[in-house]
Amino acid sequence: MKDSIPFVSPKTMEASFVLPHHGEIRGMAVFAGITLIVGGGYHGKSTLLSALQMGVYDHIAGDGREFVLADETAVKLRAEEGRSIRNTDISLFINDLPNGKDTKNFSTPDASGSTSQAAGVVEGIEAGSRLFLIDEDTSATNFMVRDDFMQQVISREKEPITPFLERARDLYEKAGVSTILVAGSSGAF
């Protein structure tokens, strides 16, 4: 791949591994927990996340993809506006909807971005995922974070959505689910 740009790991995340049929390799290791990858537009954040997403599959040796590995239970989460949700408990993230809909047994034929992403998290946990891969670009902003200004405009008691970032630590510490999040526009992450 003559026009390729080699990936260079940040020194703080660099690790080496000895492979039985290849010897020692060096690269980036992302350990369990909550990892935030930030950078400007077109700096490769989403590309890196896509490589990790594909790291659940075995690859034929030769182009480097065989060295990209991710937890086999990794799931990429995104907002899927318009998707159907049936009988899913999204109350960890969404409560007190204005129309009185039950969020412990939530169903809709036409989900919003935030309800679809909340359902995706719950479905991922139920499926046994130990790693969520999230790209800010494909997420529902109001599901991911609430900034200080919005908290002043709408009090916590009146906001039905508890942002993912407020639950990420508990998801890791209590449920054993790690998160890798790539972001480039919001400092709230």
Segments predicted by a language model, with ranges:
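N-terminal pre-Walker A segment at the start of P-loop NTPase domains
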Residues: 2-26, 61, 69-74, 78-85, ...
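Glycine-rich phosphate-binding P-loop
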Residues: 25-54
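Short, ordered loop/turn segments at secondary-structure junctions
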Residues: 42-43, 80-82, 136-139, 184-187
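Post-Walker A helix-loop "phosphate-sensing" segment adjacent to the P-loop in P-loop NTPases
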Residues: 54-65
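Flexible beta-alpha connector loops of hexameric P-loop NTPases
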Residues: 83, 91-114, 146-161
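Phosphate-binding/switch loop-helix module in NTP-utilizing enzymes
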Residues: 104-139
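Conserved P-loop NTPase nucleotide-binding/switch module
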Residues: 125-168, 172-175, 186-188
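Conserved H-loop
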Residues: 178-181
